[in-house]
């Protein structure tokens, strides 16, 4: 882990913390994170994969494509960003 990333204290219930994979880091101080989840189909009961792309704030530009990161919901930072990077769970391998 990097010491550059702020440690965020999480308190209370209902705090939105999710883990996902970085699919883009081409913006300055911003990353796009792909969140995948499984939901049950209401009629047929089959497990279906659903995904969401979320833009998050990366203050120190530490993330690379392919990293697995943890992000937390926060106040709106811009028109499309209301999530902040908490830490990098797993770094991507160099190919």
Swiss-Prot record:
Pfam families: Ribosomal_S17 (PF00366). GO terms for cellular component: cytosolic small ribosomal subunit. The keyword rRNA-binding applies. SUPFAM superfamilies: Nucleic acid-binding proteins. Gene3D superfamilies: Nucleic acid-binding proteins (2.40.50.140). Keywords: Ribonucleoprotein, Ribosomal protein, RNA-binding, rRNA-binding. GO terms for molecular function: rRNA binding; structural constituent of ribosome. One of its GO terms (biological process) is translation. HAMAP family: Ribosomal_uS17_B (MF_01345_B). PANTHER family: 40S RIBOSOMAL PROTEIN S11 FAMILY MEMBER, SMALL RIBOSOMAL SUBUNIT PROTEIN US17M. Part of the 30S ribosomal subunit. One of the primary rRNA binding proteins, it binds specifically to the 5'-end of 16S ribosomal RNA. Belongs to the universal ribosomal protein uS17 family. This is Small ribosomal subunit protein uS17. The gene is rpsQ.
């Amino acid at each position: 882990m990097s010491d550059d990333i702020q440690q965020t204290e999480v308190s209370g219930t209902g705090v939105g913390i999710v883990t996902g994979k970085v699919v883009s880091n081409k913006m300055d101080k911003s990353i796009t994170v792909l969140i995948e989840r499984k939901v049950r189909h209401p009629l047929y009961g089959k497990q279906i994969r659903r995904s969401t792309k979320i833009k998050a704030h990366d203050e120190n530009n530490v993330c690379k494509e392919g990293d697995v990161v943890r992000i937390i919901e926060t106040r709106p930072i811009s028109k499309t960003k209301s999530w902040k990077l908490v830490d990098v769970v797993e770094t991507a391998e160099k190919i």
